[in-house]
Amino acid sequence: MKREVYLDYAATTPLRKEVYEAMKPFLKEKFGNPSSIHHFGRETRTAIEEAREKIAKAIGAKSDEIIFTSGGTESNNMAIKGVAFALSTKGKHIITSKVEHHAVLEPCHFLEKLGFEITYLPVDREGFVDPDDLKKALRKDTILISIMHANNEIGTIEPIQELSKIAKEYDIYFHTDAVQTVGHIPVNVDELGVDLLSISAHKFYGPKGVGALYIRKGTKIHPLIHGGSQENNKRAGTENVAGIIGMGKAIELAILEMDKEIERLTELRDYFIREVEKRISDVYLNGPRSNRLPNNINFSFAYVEGESILLHLDLEGVEVSTGSACSSSSLEPSHVLSAINVPIELAHGSIRFTLGLYTTKEDLNYTLDVLERIIEKLRTISPYKQEWKINKKS
């Protein structure tokens, strides 16, 4: 019997009922502008500051180090461009990695057009940045290092503590895109040793269109948006009050349930990986088996196109992704899989399954059954099998 199974939690998560209830008053009755000094304004200002405190507490920061944004993309842009513009007289060299989200890579490409030099660090076959490669890439004019906390496609959790120590030795700012980790695994800015950290609410059952950037006190950064004095003069514009309230409630719930969810999702993840590898031949796990996000699974299925698998799964009620949801409409192979040296034929056959709060073992068993049938069907009609074998030999 067909059932609906959502396995694309890395792309976005459903809004929790408790979060919606917390937001509702600020969508209608509590409508005051937080910059107004009358009662309606003070009411929303107080609520925003309470939410800011929740976000700060969740990552071990101070509340005045949290700047609310429109989401992870803006937070990444603000961190990278903001530091670049603030320190351009000191240096114009930035270091990042080849497996970053496009919300980091594209700001770097933009800065290259303005005369900045960007070093894109390689990664190993599991997606890890080598600290020695970072050391070798350092220059006297390096002003920023930006390495993601965990990869959105293959789940690799990077050794941020080790990498940030290198940055500190040379007095270089360190930014991490923690969009996939905040609310899912423990994140503490002091333990990580970072100066800037990006967050997105809709990745942990909060609303879309709201996020935050942690900026360590004393970090020099220029605002991207100019206007009013909101967000400590760092991000102008009337705040998204309901969104911020929802984000605060979502992170509060995520932290309360984190330990239990890590254990549950890790068990489900490992079960799914074992079953896929047992039932289906010529399948390859992309990314590491340990030091991996508890909800992330990425497989390459030989001889078939990932898009065909995705569409057939969709017809069976199973929702998955072929990579980052922000660029999965592209026909180009994933830049992440290319960076870990996955052959192009296998990269085109990749599917990402990401689990979440409402994923059950029954969901996974249903998915396994339909996936097995789909792969078998697609391989019987695939024109790629012989071609792939020829390319593999050459």
From Swiss-Prot:
Q: Which cofactor does it need?
A: pyridoxal 5'-phosphate
- Any one Pfam family match given in the protein's UniProt record, by short name: Aminotran_5
Q: Which UniProt keywords apply?
A: 2Fe-2S, Cytoplasm, Iron, Iron-sulfur, Metal-binding, Pyridoxal phosphate, Transferase
Q: Which InterPro entries match?
A: Aminotrans_V_dom (IPR000192), Aminotrans_V_PyrdxlP_BS (IPR020578), Cys_deSase_IscS (IPR010240), Cys_deSase_NifS_bac/arc (IPR017772), Cysteine_dSase (IPR016454), PyrdxlP-dep_Trfase (IPR015424), PyrdxlP-dep_Trfase_major (IPR015421), PyrdxlP-dep_Trfase_small (IPR015422)
Q: Where is pyridoxal 5'-phosphate annotated to bind?
A: G72, T73, N152, Q180, S200, A201, H202, T238
**BP GO terms, sorted:** [2Fe-2S] cluster assembly; amino acid metabolic process
Kindly list the positions at which N6-(pyridoxal phosphate)lysine occurs in this protein: K203
Matching entries from NCBIfam families are given as: FeS_nifS, PRK02948.1
Explain the purpose of this protein.
Master enzyme that delivers sulfur to a number of partners involved in Fe-S cluster assembly, tRNA modification or cofactor biosynthesis. Catalyzes the removal of elemental sulfur atoms from cysteine to produce alanine. Functions as a sulfur delivery protein for Fe-S cluster synthesis onto IscU, an Fe-S scaffold assembly protein, as well as other S acceptor proteins.
Q: What is this protein's record name?
A: Cysteine desulfurase IscS
What organism is the protein native to?
A: Dictyoglomus turgidum (strain DSM 6724 / Z-1310)
